[in-house]
């Protein structure tokens, strides 16, 4: 049987088949890794610091660009269907 590796970027942990965390079809070693460390939660493995690879609160898009993308996706003029 193939060894499962955690789907978290920069995580080098093996996934325990009896304690796997699934998210979007990928296997992760912990809930923190499955959620991509949204609040900087550490990886449970003492020698792994994959939580450092995530950009907590960072993004490469301005609020104005985000507003425009949202308006393009959900125009205010579209009627809401019941």
UniProtKB/Swiss-Prot annotation:
Binding site for Zn(2+) 1: 11, 43, 48, 50
Gene3D superfamilies assigned: 2.30.170.10
InterPro entries: Metalthion_dom_sf, Metalthion_fam14_prok
Binding residue positions for Zn(2+) 2: 8, 33, 37, 50
Residues binding Zn(2+) 3: 6, 11, 29, 33
Impact when changing residue 12 to N: No effect on metal ion binding capacity
Binding site for Cd(2+) 1: 11, 13, 29, 43
MF terms (GO), sorted A to Z: cadmium ion binding; zinc ion binding
Disruption phenotype: No effect on cell growth in the presence of excess Zn(2+)/Cd(2+) or in metal-limited conditions. Reduced long term survival.
Domain of life: Bacteria
Residues at which Cd(2+) 4 binds: 6, 11, 29, 33
Family: Belongs to the metallothionein superfamily.
Stated role: Metallothioneins are small proteins that have a high content of cysteine residues which allow them to bind heavy metal ions through clusters of thiolate bonds. Preferentially, binds four Cd(2+) ions. Also binds three Zn(2+) ions but with less affinity. Required for long-term viability. May play a role in the storage or sequestration of metals when present in excess.
Protein name as annotated: Metallothionein
């Amino acid at each position: 049987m193939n060894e499962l590796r955690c789907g978290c970027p920069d995580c080098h942990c093996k996934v325990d088949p009896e304690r796997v965390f699934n998210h979007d079809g990928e296997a992760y070693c912990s809930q923190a890794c499955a959620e991509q460390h949204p609040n900087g939660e550490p990886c449970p493995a003492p020698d792994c610091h994959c939580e450092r690879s995530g950009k907590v609160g960072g993004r490469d898009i301005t609020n104005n660009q985000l507003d425009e993308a949202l308006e393009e996706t959900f125009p205010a003029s579209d009627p809401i269907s019941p």
